[in-house]
């Protein structure tokens, strides 16, 4: 077995001279691709290219292309009010947000090309897709590349098609891309092969023969085939490309020769595997152009095969003494410090290594390198919090301080007493003190700092290592000693040397060393980021100091993440401004970066607002900056209130009210800063006269404050909630160290124990249950609906913020069983939001490895920051880890490690930002408010105006002055959201949620109050074996007095044994797998011919609009919907339920059609047998029109277009003889759903969008058993016609009215089986890589695996639903509004049944003939579908008939039906509320079921 390989990553480092130090930081950014300056574009056309390093796109390119307008979501019309009311929404903008995704299938396009026509790009596309499949595991990248170049694509349309016969000669090696096949051996054993499995010849030219018979299990099976000759040549050629490095007769390293393109310019040897010692040595060897990221990959992954980093450290120190290796060693250490500084922090041995290395650099006079090392250390160092206590105020401090704002520096620790508590706490020389007891020390005089430290016995100190600035401070002090006077730079020099061009600046950091200070007012502005206010100020004020680039000090992430090629920002443009006034032994090294680490060199910019009260409750709004102190606020407040006293007579007080109503008042220290962040919602700032003891806040005011601090979700701005969620998620996401992914994946022990990763992992569960808790705790139904609407809007805005994690969590919360079952609540939701919710769900369609989501994520303009869906990240990493061996032939499989490292770099790049997290998500809010707050500002404001408005011309004229009140209100809303989110009480127990759900809407509420109110009626036939209790109920059901012949046939059909839906999913070794043969007319054309056969018929059928039902039912199925024409509504093949993806795209991998997951193995023999089998196994084996209708209704749920009747006509006869089959879930059908039937489940992702399995197994539970009875609730036994041929149109119309239950699958979230997929998903952590995401990996399409040792049971947990009439009852007029009521309290109820229009009545003059009335294979002359326009016109003119039309069967009170007349014409039945036919069902509560002998378990 050969180790995996990946396309080589071309970083800048790979092109530079290896022996020279990079001249600037651009060379230190080892990036996979260079990112341009972040420009903000609408999210539909945006997308950071999170693609592979070789330029290939990821698997998501299956649905490659743009999202059309889907993500534009120009919600500028949503005003920011306390509550976003329904009426305030801009209809146009919301609707634009809900446009469907339009994508094309690039991988399919590449596969369908002739192999000789494939370009390098095509091969890269295929390579990226194929590497996910198990069949290609442990192959080197060059082998995969060659296989992709010669593979041929084949499609087998129909389930049950024999692909290979026993004893047939094999001619190819094949891999299943979609669907599954079953191999039946002569001894009767059977084996299932799924997506990603391979079969066929072994890599020899010997003749091999098929063992057993291979049949397709599902429709639309897709394969790639490689001819035996090519397969043999490619795999045997591998050895020729290998270069083995031997030492003392043992192989210590294996390299592979690789060509990355056909030009021959990118070729060389790349390390495949080696011993740990040899891999370490390779760090300082020459690296080829095809292996530019070896050092980065090694430094990230060495921990998987080395016990200690010092093994590498010792070697590096040793090699440093070799002058020829010195530069390379320095480069490795710089990269190590920059990329993984956490390896050094907290590890004494590594800290000593770093100090020793610094000493070596000093010794060798490598000042430039040393400076870079110090910059990297300072940039990557994390803030540390330590607590010191002194016995008394007079006790001396155990450390000596230097610096101070008077020197233009912060406060630094010069020395620490050895053995003191400060040393034990981790304080060391070179630490900068950032904060003490909440007071900012970044811009404070040394004397003031010493005073604060001395006057407190309890010290909570925040420090950060900043050796770079500390050494500059020492240099300055030594210069002053020599020169005798402090150096004060001229103002002109500062301005000249510090011009910044913000758009060219791509680092999210502050200017480096602020040596120049004009006065103490030039404070360290740590709020970060430019904004609109800044732009306004710049017009009216001369900036003495340079404008500050984006930074993020004080937001929880130090300004470290983009200085020397950090993990997030992978690129610093060469166009960085020069601002160097610093003397240096090697100034050119720092010409564009020596300002990066200054914490105290920016002007004081007011971008926050405080509301300050006086004792008489007057208030003023005061503009401040983050570092404005309480003393300065007092001065401003005195001026604003026009008080004549001196500032010394007043102080700033904070008055707060506890939840118990206790008023607290405290005077704030004069030097306290960050005032806007400290104020609580239940607090106010007061200007207090020190000489008076007045009451600042009365009891009435306190009560008002208390009321204001009590927040409900509906009071909060959806935009602000989404913004705060995104900021919180992003903080967690960006703080994850790359090494944490490795530690978690390989289960390594680490100092941090992956704390950041675990926190981010937990967020998705917390947010999911937050949604459910918030909805279910609301007792008022209307408010519940509004909360659901609120969450949909929040999810929409999360998408704007590219926060896919929260968006997914919210959608998951809305789909949790206890929420989804609230039918009456969902019914009240406006159509617009229903559609929005549907579109949001669409994005996370799990089919084909989350292809739609990946496509959006990889779209070309999506720029960071991006918060990806974490479970997908974890699943991908787990697949790479578990799908490939860590050691091959006793050597470390470095190819596997390289692939994992590349994936982690891709994830890290999503967090690469160059602005403050507090601002980055606000820039996506477009023009939400008429006057944006500063916190929404951006230097790219002009770009935003153009790019984010989606072409809308309407603009709100911005005020040219600052509206402090508006800014305060915006900030107050942000505070409310923060407080709300911080005080959430989550209900994480699903049982408790279910209880709350039942309290909101008791199970009895799902029963119809009367027959005519559009509520469903229950059916009695169940496709599953009921539990014991249900069986007893079924036996007690009153039996019909006589049985029509069709029922007898059905009864015979019931004797057909049930077929297991749960074949084994065990993986089979490739060598044991049966393969394609060559007994076809042309070698290698076996499957292709099968594919072409269907293709011809498809084209024929597409031309025949008037095809007969009989012929269509018995004819060969069309080719797959993936084949062109892509969007044709071709007939679904026999045995399908739906073969169409929901957007008209083709699907290649991971997901076959619904029937691919649900078809049974038995092959229909005759029409009657087929019909019997259908009933016995509860599957629609032959509903030809179904696919089209599901397809149509899925795409346009609001428009069950009249055009749908035309394609439907081809399959009508089928429905006339269909049988009634019920669902195991508490589905409901409604009377007026026909026109707008939304059959979202037609593609596997829609039916079960939370399923990660490519096979979407829950569709077997939802679609197969829900859809089967929904599509067949009207047979000849259901209608009032039996003698004359009843109108096909009538049955079709009945089908329209009855057949579909809107959202039946989408919201049918809880198939009663506790072990069902939905239950497993909602209970398990979404982030579980081996459970929810890992188990359902790509390799097992079309089968259902065992979970937790039990088969996923389709059997209902409490009881199965039953149909109103069975084949054994006499024909009873079936009310059009068949309803299904739940006898279980936990079932999910499909919602919105009562909303849709009824379909038009049966057009007069058309008759339908049951398909059983004429022999198979012959079309009936009278079965020509009506002309569409005529039928439509007539249907509009004819009034509906009610129960008055002719006598009807009357249901006896005890449920014994009698037939009162033969049925001559199809009639629409709209019974009165007191319709006697429904009485028995009302009285019985619809809890009865058929006899158990009628029940055939589908399991």
UniProtKB/Swiss-Prot annotation:
Q: Which InterPro entries match?
A: cNMP-bd_dom, cNMP-bd_dom_sf, PDZ, PDZ_sf, RA_dom, Ras-like_Gua-exchang_fac_N, Ras_GEF_dom_sf, RASGEF_cat_dom
Q: Where in the cell is it found?
A: Cytoplasm; Cytoplasm, Perinuclear region; Cell membrane; Late endosome
Superkingdom of origin = Eukaryota
**Ras-associating domain mapped to chain residues:** 606-692
- UniProt: a nucleoside 3',5'-cyclic phosphate binding residues: 135-254
> In what residue span(s) does the N-terminal Ras-GEF domain sit?
267-380
**Stretches the record annotates as Disordered:** 40-59, 68-101, 1002-1050, 1095-1160, 1224-1256, 1305-1499
List Phosphothreonine occurrences by residue: 644
User: Where is the PTM Phosphoserine found along the chain?
Assistant: 501, 806, 930, 933, 1022, 1080, 1089, 1095, 1116, 1120, 1159, 1176
Instruction: State where it is primarily located.
Output: cytoplasm
Q: Where is the Ras-GEF domain?
A: 717-944
Ranges of compositional bias, category Low complexity: 1031-1040, 1111-1125, 1141-1160, 1355-1366
Q: How is it modified after translation?
A: Ubiquitinated by NEDD4, leading to proteasomal degradation.
| Residues covered by the PDZ domain | 385-470
Q: Give Gene Ontology CC terms.
A: apical plasma membrane; bicellular tight junction; cell-cell junction; cytoplasm; cytosol; endocytic vesicle; late endosome; membrane
UniProt lists compositionally biased (Acidic residues) regions at: 83-94, 1488-1499
Clinical disorder:
Epilepsy, familial adult myoclonic, 7: A form of familial myoclonic epilepsy, a neurologic disorder characterized by cortical hand tremors, myoclonic jerks and occasional generalized or focal seizures with a non-progressive or very slowly progressive disease course. Usually, myoclonic tremor is the presenting symptom, characterized by tremulous finger movements and myoclonic jerks of the limbs increased by action and posture. In a minority of patients, seizures are the presenting symptom. Some patients exhibit mild cognitive impairment. FAME7 inheritance is autosomal dominant.
What exactly does this protein do? Functions as a guanine nucleotide exchange factor (GEF), which activates Rap and Ras family of small GTPases by exchanging bound GDP for free GTP in a cAMP-dependent manner. Serves as a link between cell surface receptors and Rap/Ras GTPases in intracellular signaling cascades. Also acts as an effector for Rap1 by direct association with Rap1-GTP thereby leading to the amplification of Rap1-mediated signaling. Shows weak activity on HRAS. It is controversial whether RAPGEF2 binds cAMP and cGMP or not.
Q: How does it assemble?
A: Interacts with CDH1, CTNNB1 and TJP1. Interacts (via C-terminal domain) with MAGI2 (via PDZ and WW domains); the interaction occurs before or after NGF stimulation. Interacts with KIDINS220 and NTRK1; the interactions occur after NGF stimulation. Found in a complex, at least composed of KIDINS220, MAGI2, NTRK1 and RAPGEF2; the complex is mainly formed at late endosomes in a neuronal growth factor (NGF)-dependent manner.
Free-text note regarding domains: The Ras-associating domain is necessary for the Rap guanine nucleotide exchange activity. The N-terminal regionis necessary for cAMP-binding. The PDZ domain is necessary for its targeting to the cell membrane.
PANTHER family in alphabetical order:
CYTOSKELETON-ASSOCIATED PROTEIN 4, RAP GUANINE NUCLEOTIDE EXCHANGE FACTOR 2
Q: Which family does it belong to?
A: Belongs to the RAPGEF2 family.
Q: What is the name listed in the Swiss-Prot or TrEMBL entry for this protein? A: Rap guanine nucleotide exchange factor 2
Q: What organism does the record attribute this protein to?
A: Homo sapiens (Human)
């Amino acid at each position: 077995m050969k180790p995996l390989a990946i396309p080589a990553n071309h970083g800048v480092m790979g092109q530079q001279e290896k022996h020279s130090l990079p001249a600037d930081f651009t060379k230190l950014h080892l990036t996979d691709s260079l990112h341009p300056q972040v420009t903000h574009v609408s999210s539909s056309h945006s997308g950071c290219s999170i693609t592979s390093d070789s330029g290939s796109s990821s698997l998501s390119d299956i649905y490659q292309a743009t999202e059309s307008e889907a993500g534009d979501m120009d919600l500028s019309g949503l005003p920011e009010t306390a509550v976003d009311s329904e009426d305030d929404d801009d209809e146009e903008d919301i609707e634009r947000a809900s446009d469907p995704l339009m994508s094309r299938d690039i991988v399919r396009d590449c596969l369908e090309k002739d192999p000789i026509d494939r370009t390098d790009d095509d091969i890269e596309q295929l390579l990226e897709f194929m590497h996910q499949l198990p069949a290609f595991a442990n192959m080197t990248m060059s082998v995969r590349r060659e296989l992709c170049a010669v593979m041929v694509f084949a499609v087998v349309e129909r389930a049950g098609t024999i692909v290979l016969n026993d004893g047939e000669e094999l001619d190819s090696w094949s891999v299943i891309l979609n669907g599954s096949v079953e191999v039946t051996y002569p001894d009767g054993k059977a084996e299932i092969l799924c997506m990603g499995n391979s079969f066929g010849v072994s890599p020899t030219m010997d003749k091999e023969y098929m063992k057993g018979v291979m049949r397709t299990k599902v429709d639309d099976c897709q394969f790639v085939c490689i001819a035996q000759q090519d397969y043999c040549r490619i795999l045997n050629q591998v050895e020729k490309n290998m270069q083995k490095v031997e030492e003392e007769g043992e192989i210590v390293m294996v390299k592979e020769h690789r060509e990355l393109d056909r030009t021959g310019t990118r070729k060389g040897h790349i390390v495949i595997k080696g011993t740990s010692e040899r891999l370490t040595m390779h760090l300082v060897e020459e690296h080829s152009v095809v292996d530019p990221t070896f050092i980065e990959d090694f430094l990230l992954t060495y921990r998987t095969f080395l016990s200690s980093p010092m093994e590498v450290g010792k070697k590096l120190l040793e090699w440093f003494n070799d002058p020829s290796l010195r530069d390379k060693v320095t480069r490795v250490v710089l990269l190590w410090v920059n990329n993984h500084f956490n390896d050094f922090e907290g590890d004494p041995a590594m800290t000593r290594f770093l100090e020793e290395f610094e000493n070596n650099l000093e010794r060798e006079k490598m000042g430039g390198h040393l400076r870079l090392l110090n910059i990297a250390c300072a940039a990557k160092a994390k803030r540390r919090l330590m607590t010191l206590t002194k016995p008394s105020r007079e006790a001396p401090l155990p450390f000596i301080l230097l610096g101070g704002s008077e020197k233009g520096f912060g406060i630094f620790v010069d020395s620490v007493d050895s053995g003191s508590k400060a040393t034990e706490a981790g304080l060391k020389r070179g630490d900068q003190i950032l904060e003490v007891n909440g007071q900012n020390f970044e811009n404070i005089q040394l004397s003031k700092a010493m005073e604060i430290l001395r006057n407190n016995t309890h010290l909570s100190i925040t420090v950060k290592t900043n050796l770079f600035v500390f050494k500059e401070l020492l240099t300055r002090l030594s210069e002053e000693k020599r020169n005798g006077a402090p150096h004060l730079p001229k103002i002109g020099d500062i301005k000249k040397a510090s011009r910044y061009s913000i758009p060219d600046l791509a680092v999210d950091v502050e200017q480096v060393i602020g040596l120049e200070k004009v006065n103490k007012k030039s404070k360290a502005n740590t709020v970060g980021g430019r904004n609109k206010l800044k732009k306004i100020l710049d017009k009216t004020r001369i900036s003495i100091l340079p404008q500050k680039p984006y930074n993020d000090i004080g937001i929880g992430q130090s300004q470290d993440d983009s200085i020397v090629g950090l993990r997030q920002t992978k690129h610093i443009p060469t166009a960085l401004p020069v601002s160097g006034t610093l003397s240096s032994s090697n100034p050119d090294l720092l010409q564009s970066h020596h300002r990066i680490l200054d914490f105290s060199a920016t002007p004081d910019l007011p971008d926050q607002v405080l509301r300050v009260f006086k004792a008489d409750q007057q208030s003023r709004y005061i503009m401040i900056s983050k570092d404005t102190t309480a003393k300065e606020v007092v001065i401003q407040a005195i001026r604003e209130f026009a008080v004549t006293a001196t500032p010394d007579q007043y102080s700033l007080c904070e008055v707060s009210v506890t939840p118990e109503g206790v008023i607290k008042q405290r005077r704030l220290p004069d030097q306290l800063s960050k005032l806007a962040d400290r104020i609580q919602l239940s607090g106010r700032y007061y200007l207090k006269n020190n000489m008076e003891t007045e009451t600042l806040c009365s009891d009435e005011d306190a009560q008002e404050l208390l009321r204001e601090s009590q927040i409900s979700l509906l009071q909060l701005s959806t935009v602000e909630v989404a913004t705060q969620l995104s900021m919180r998620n992003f903080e967690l996401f960006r703080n994850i160290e790359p090494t944490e992914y490795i530690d978690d994946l390989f289960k390594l022990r680490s100092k941090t124990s992956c704390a950041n990763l675990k926190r981010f992992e937990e967020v998705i569960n917390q947010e999911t249950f937050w949604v459910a808790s918030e909805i279910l705790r609301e007792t008022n139904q209307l408010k519940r609906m509004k909360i659901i609407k609120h969450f949909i809007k929040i999810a929409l805005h999360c998408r704007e913020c590219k926060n896919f994690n929260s968006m997914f969590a919210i959608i998951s919360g809305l789909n949790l069983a206890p929420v989804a079952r609230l039918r009456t609540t969902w019914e009240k939701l406006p159509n617009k939001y229903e559609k929005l919710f549907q579109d949001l769900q669409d994005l996370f369609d799990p089919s084909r490895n989350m292809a739609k989501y990946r496509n959006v994520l990889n779209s070309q303009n999506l720029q960071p920051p991006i918060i990806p869906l974490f479970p997908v990240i974890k699943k991908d990493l787990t697949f790479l880890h578990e799908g490939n061996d860590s050691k091959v032939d006793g050597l470390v499989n470095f190819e596997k490690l390289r692939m994992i490292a590349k994936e982690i770099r891709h994830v890290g790049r999503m967090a690469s930002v160059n602005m403050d997290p507090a601002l980055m998500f606000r820039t996506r809010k477009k023009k939400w408010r008429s006057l944006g707050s500063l916190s929404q500002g951006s230097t790219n404001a002009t770009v935003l105006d153009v790019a984010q408005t989606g072409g809308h011309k309407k603009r709100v004229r911005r005020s040219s002055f600052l509206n402090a009140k508006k800014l305060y209100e915006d900030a107050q809303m942000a505070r409310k959201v923060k407080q709300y989110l911080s005080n959430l009480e989550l209900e994480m127990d699903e049982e408790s949620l279910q209880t709350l759900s039942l309290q909101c809407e008791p199970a009895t509420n799902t029963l119809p109050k009367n027959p005519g109110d559009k509520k469903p009626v229950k059916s009695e036939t169940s496709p599953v074996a009921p539990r014991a209790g249900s069986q007893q109920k079924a036996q007690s059901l009153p039996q019909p007095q006589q049985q029509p012949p069709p029922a007898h046939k059905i009864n015979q059909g019931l004797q057909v044994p049930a077929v297991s839906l749960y074949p084994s999913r065990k993986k089979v070794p490739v060598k044991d797998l049966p393969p394609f043969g060559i007994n076809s007319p042309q070698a290698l054309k076996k499957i292709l011919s099968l594919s072409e056969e269907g293709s011809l018929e498809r084209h024929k059928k597409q031309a025949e609009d008037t095809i007969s039902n009989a012929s269509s039912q018995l004819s060969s199925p069309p080719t797959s919907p993936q084949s062109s024409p892509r969007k044709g509504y071709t007939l679904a093949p026999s045995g399908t339920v739906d073969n169409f993806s929901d957007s008209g795209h083709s699907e290649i991998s991971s997901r076959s059609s619904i029937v691919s997951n649900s078809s049974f193995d038995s092959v229909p023999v005759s029409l009657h047998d087929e019909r019997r089998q259908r009933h016995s196994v509860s599957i629609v084996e032959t509903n030809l029109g179904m696919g089209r209708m599901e397809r149509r209704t899925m795409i346009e749920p609001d428009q069950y277009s009249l055009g749908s009747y035309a394609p439907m006509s081809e399959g009508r006869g089928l429905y006339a003889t269909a049988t009634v089959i019920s669902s195991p879930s508490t589905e409901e059908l409604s009377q007026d759903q026909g026109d707008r039937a939304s059959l979202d489940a037609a593609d596997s992702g829609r039916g079960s969008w939370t399923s990660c399995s490519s096979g979407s197994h829950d569709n077997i539970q939802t679609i197969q058993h829900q859809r089967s009875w929904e599509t067949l609730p009207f047979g000849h036994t259901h209608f009032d016609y039996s003698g004359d041929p009843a109108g096909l149109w009538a049955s079709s119309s009945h089908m329209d009215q009855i057949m579909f239950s809107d959202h039946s699958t989408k919201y049918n979230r809880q198939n009663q089986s506790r072990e069902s997929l939905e239950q497993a998903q909602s209970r398990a952590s979404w982030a579980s890589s081996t459970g929810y995401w890992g188990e359902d990996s790509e390799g097992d399409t079309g089968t259902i695996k065992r979970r937790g040792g039990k088969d996923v049971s389709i059997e209902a947990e409490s009881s199965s639903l039953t149909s109103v009439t069975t084949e054994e009852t006499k024909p009873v007029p079936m009310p059009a509004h068949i309803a299904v009521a739940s006898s279980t309290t936990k079932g999910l109820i499909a919602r919105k049944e009562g909303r849709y229009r009824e379909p038009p009545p049966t057009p007069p003059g058309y008759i339908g003939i049951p398909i059983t009335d004429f022999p198979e294979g012959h079309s009936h002359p009278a079965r020509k579908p009506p002309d569409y326009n005529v039928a439509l016109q007539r249907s509009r003119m004819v009034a509906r008939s009610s129960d008055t039309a002719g006598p009807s069967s009357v249901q006896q009170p005890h449920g014994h039906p009698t037939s009162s007349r033969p049925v001559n014409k199809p009639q629409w039945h709209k019974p009165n509320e007191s319709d006697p036919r429904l009485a028995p069902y009302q009285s019985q509560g619809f809890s009865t079921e058929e006899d158990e002998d009628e029940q055939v378990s589908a399991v």
